[in-house]
Amino acid sequence: MAKRDYYEVLGVNRNATEAEVKKAFRRLAMKYHPDRNPGDKDAEVKFKEAREAYEVLCDSRKRASYDQFGHAGVEQTFGGAGAGGFGFGDLGDIFDDIFGDIFGGARGGQAREQRGADLAYELVLSLEEAVHGLSRTIKVPTWINCKTCNGSGAKKGSSPATCPRCNGSGQMRMQHGFLQVQQTCSVCRGRGQVIKDPCTDCHGQGRQQQTKTLSVKIPPGIDTGDRIRLAGEGEAGLFGAPPGDLYVQVRVKPHPLFHREGNDLHSEVPIDFTTAALGGEMEIPTLDGSVRLTIPPETQGGKQFRLRGKGVKALRSGAVGDLICHIVVETPVKLSPEQKDYLKQFAELLKKDEKNHSPRTRNWFDSVKDFFTSK
């Protein structure tokens, strides 16, 4: 059976905020949680469906993938929602609100601050930038504390009042037969206070949307998959609560000359067949300038030369990798008739000589001969 749209499951629109998604899930969890519907298979299915939708829509990366590619995007990129198994521990504060007080066990009932959401930002770097490090300015759309009310949500000169329904606890106790549960107050949404005279700039939310400009220091040696945490640079919390963090995810672009493996750099170095046979010197580029590489006579294709200390300085240990040059011997092309004649004469000279000028070729033919004669 085809999966339902996650937004439809939770009953929210596609532009719903994280807080709205969480609120919708709380409502469904209260209604369909298995502990409140023992033996009801239909309720269990609906609860699992709501939980799966919540896990995707409250995760910024999963939600972006879902919005673009649907269910297939989440399954292919993240292994599907709830890939870690069906459990309740990862829903933390939501189940604290719903089942914080079972069988009369009090939990203290104090209002809880709603910390701002964490943000993710992908930073694309060149290989040179990743190896040497730099400072980069980035622009991040986010929520900041309202400067007019300093995040309180109340109009200047006024202040929030104690919620008349929960008396400032932020939570309400509900009795369902022998089961007593404690849930977030629907009036103050767990804050314990209400705004009677809201700030006109932020409309009582205590925060406003703004694009924040930040300077990020990129340490030398960083690589794709590494991330930098900027504490407190995420979204502002609701009504003056602490902000979340910003995680800068690094992605290094492919380089035309070098391929990185750990702290080593690899590069293909093409040489003509005369240099391979007679030897010579070449100018080899590195990320710190060029160096001279001596090619010894009779160098074969696939030969590797290791240039010590010309790789990447490790991000944590400080050890420096090497540059490994992979020799590629090129066969000449677009030969003139005269050049072809010289090569034919050269080939005849090699045949007349009893020396083994191509040991790998001879060994290969000997192996082929042995293979067929042994049949």
Curated annotation (Swiss-Prot):
Q: Which windows of the sequence hold CXXCXGXG motif repeats?
A: 146-153, 163-170, 185-192, 199-206
Residue positions binding Zn(2+) 1: 146, 149, 199, 202
Question: Residue limits of the J domain?
Answer: 5-70
Its cofactor is: Zn(2+)
TM ranges: none
Q: Where in the cell is it found?
A: Cytoplasm
Question: Which Gene Ontology CC terms are recorded?
Answer: cytoplasm
The cross-references to SUPFAM superfamilies, in alphabetical order and at most eight, read: Chaperone J-domain, DnaJ/Hsp40 cysteine-rich domain, HSP40/DnaJ peptide-binding domain
Print the keywords alphabetically. Chaperone, Cytoplasm, DNA replication, Metal-binding, Repeat, Stress response, Zinc, Zinc-finger
Q: How is the cofactor bound?
A: Binds 2 Zn(2+) ions per monomer.
Q: Where are the zinc fingers (CR-type)?
A: 133-211
> What are the GO MF terms of this UniProt record?
ATP binding; heat shock protein binding; unfolded protein binding; zinc ion binding
Is Repressor set as a keyword in this record? no
GO terms under biological process: chaperone cofactor-dependent protein refolding; DNA replication; protein refolding; response to heat
Instruction: Give me the residues that bind Zn(2+) 2, please.
Output: 163, 166, 185, 188
Protein's job: Participates actively in the response to hyperosmotic and heat shock by preventing the aggregation of stress-denatured proteins and by disaggregating proteins, also in an autonomous, DnaK-independent fashion. Unfolded proteins bind initially to DnaJ; upon interaction with the DnaJ-bound protein, DnaK hydrolyzes its bound ATP, resulting in the formation of a stable complex. GrpE releases ADP from DnaK; ATP binding to DnaK triggers the release of the substrate protein, thus completing the reaction cycle.
The entry describes its oligomerization and partners as: Homodimer.
Task: Give the family this protein belongs to, as stated in its UniProt record.
Answer: Belongs to the DnaJ family.
Q: Any notes on this protein's domains?
A: The J domain is necessary and sufficient to stimulate DnaK ATPase activity. Zinc center 1 plays an important role in the autonomous, DnaK-independent chaperone activity of DnaJ. Zinc center 2 is essential for interaction with DnaK and for DnaJ activity.
In Swiss-Prot or TrEMBL terms, this protein is called Chaperone protein DnaJ
Q: Which organism is it from?
A: Coxiella burnetii (strain Dugway 5J108-111)
